[in-house]
């Protein structure tokens, strides 16, 4: 059963990816358990246990573990979700503002969650996470709506509009150049002023159309002529130009407005609504906030931080946190962390192995002890003696203290429920399944 197969490395990389996709966490666990299962399977092969029997035992053990995970879980409320977020943020450079960021992440997830009879569904695309260097992390905000990295086109325009009626325009608000780029022969000064008057009148008409529709806010995907800007500001209209296509679509969804390609077609029915559109100074630049959108399925989070590096770190940590909170909210169950549940499952599987006859029993026992690689690794990372830690952990679990695990930050075996270290059950479930499937696949290759 000589390992070192070229496919093994790629397979292990694959499980890491699957784990990341499904759970945003626990990638290391999946890979570490898979490696340990392979080590144990070699020992079994040396004792003349056939790979097919090992595969069957691993499968039985994995299924049993997944079935038993629920017995170790507890229900989820908002407070519990905050603890899950805090656990995800622990040990990252955002440590000091953990409480603050975990609150924002839970609020963001709960405001986009769709609830139905079967439970909750969270689409993380509905949380737009933006970062802006400057200020401190505590200046980060959650906005019920959309943030545009833009400023109004003319300083004479209002900085803020309440009860915004928004025209979403996908054409330039400027004079259309004559189709044939003819040099217009202007021989007489009167002709020039007449020509300019016509341009002016054309732009004035365009702005009148906007005013007639009832719009007081214009978000334009293309350019806006200087003169048109001037007329708009005279009419008290707030306007942005060159908005991103993705922002236009998000605005359309949130405000209920329709994107029009031609101002001639603009009518009141096309307008989107928001309770407020406002330009605010964020750091060194201005950004526009569109808030209180009636159909907003999405929220925006603006993350701040003193340097580029800090903002990037905060964004990475925050995205992990919302990912894990979303999973916990969808599953409606969380587990205590620190390897506590893995240790409990290891004990459960030892008992399960005793009730199983046949040679699979050895494989289930091997699976049970392979799981202990997780608390062992945690102990090593915390600078604790791994052997003593496992002994302490087994002792605690044999006394029914099934929430005891390894606390990396305080060092030692403690009650993880008291230490408030929690993770979604899906993370542990997926890690065990992925590890088992990978080990079985590689055993088959070598069989």
Go through each PLM region and give its residues.
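N-terminal cofactor/phosphate-binding cores enriched in small/glycine residues
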Residues: 1-36
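Extended, low-charge hydrophobic alpha-helical regions
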Residues: 4-6, 298-302, 306-447
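Metallocofactor- and cofactor-centric catalytic cores in central/energy metabolism, strongly enriched
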Residues: 9, 20, 56, 68, ...
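Hydrophobic, well-structured modules enriched for small/aliphatic residues and gly/pro motifs
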Residues: 21-30, 43, 47-61, 65
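Short glycine/serine/threonine-rich phosphate/pyrophosphate-binding segments
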Residues: 23-31, 177-178, 225-227, 248-249, ...
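Alpha-helical transmembrane segments of multi-pass membrane proteins, especially transporters
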Residues: 27, 31-32, 52-59, 361-369, ...
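Glycine/charge-rich, flexible interdomain linkers and switch-proximal surface loops
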Residues: 29, 75-85, 121-130, 385-408
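Extended amphipathic alpha-helical scaffolds
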Residues: 60-306, 313
């Amino acid at each position: 059963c000589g390992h070192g197969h070229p496919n093994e490395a790629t397979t292990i990389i694959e499980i890491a990816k699957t784990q990341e996709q499904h759970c945003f966490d626990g990638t290391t666990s999946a890979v570490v358990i898979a490696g340990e299962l392979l080590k144990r399977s070699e020992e079994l092969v040396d004792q003349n246990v056939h790979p097919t029997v090992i595969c069957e035992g691993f499968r039985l053990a994995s299924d049993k573990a997944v079935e038993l995970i629920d017995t170790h879980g507890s229900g989820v409320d908002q407070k519990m979700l905050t603890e899950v977020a805090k656990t995800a943020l622990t040990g990252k450079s955002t440590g000091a503002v953990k409480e603050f960021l975990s609150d924002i992440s839970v609020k963001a997830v709960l405001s986009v969650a769709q609830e139905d009879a079967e439970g909750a569904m969270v689409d993380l695309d509905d949380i737009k996470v933006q970062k802006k260097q400057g200020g401190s992390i505590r200046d980060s905000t959650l906005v019920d709506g959309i943030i545009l990295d833009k400023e109004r086109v003319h300083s004479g325009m209002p900085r803020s509009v309440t009860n915004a009626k928004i025209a979403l325009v996908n054409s330039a608000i400027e004079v259309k150049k004559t189709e044939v780029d003819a040099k217009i022969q202007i021989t007489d000064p009167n002709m020039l002023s007449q020509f300019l008057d016509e341009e002016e009148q054309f732009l004035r008409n365009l702005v009148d159309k906007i005013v007639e529709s009832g719009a007081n806010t214009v978000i334009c995907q293309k350019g806006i002529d200087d003169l048109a800007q001037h007329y708009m500001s005279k009419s008290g209209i707030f306007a942005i130009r060159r908005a991103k296509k993705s922002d236009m679509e998000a605005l359309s969804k949130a405000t209920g407005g329709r994107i029009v390609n031609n101002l001639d077609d603009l009518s009141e029915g096309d307008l989107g609504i928001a309770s407020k559109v406002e330009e605010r100074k964020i750091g060194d630049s201005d950004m526009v906030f569109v808030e209180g959108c009636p159909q907003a399925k999405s929220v925006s989070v603006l993350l701040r931080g003193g340097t580029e590096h800090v903002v990037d770190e905060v964004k990475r940590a925050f995205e992990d946190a919302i990912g894990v909170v979303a999973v916990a909210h969808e599953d409606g169950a969380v587990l205590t962390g620190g390897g506590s549940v893995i240790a409990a499952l290891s004990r459960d599987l030892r008992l399960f192995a005793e009730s199983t006859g046949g040679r699979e029993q050895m494989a289930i026992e091997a699976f049970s002890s392979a799981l202990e690689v997780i608390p062992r690794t945690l102990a090593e990372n915390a600078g604790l003696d791994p052997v003593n830690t496992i002994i302490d952990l087994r002792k605690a679990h044999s006394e029914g203290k099934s929430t005891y695990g390894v606390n990396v930050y305080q060092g030692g075996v403690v009650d993880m429920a008291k230490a408030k270290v929690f993770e979604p059950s899906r993370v542990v479930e997926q890690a065990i399944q992925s590890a088992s499937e990978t080990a079985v696949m590689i055993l088959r290759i070598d069989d």
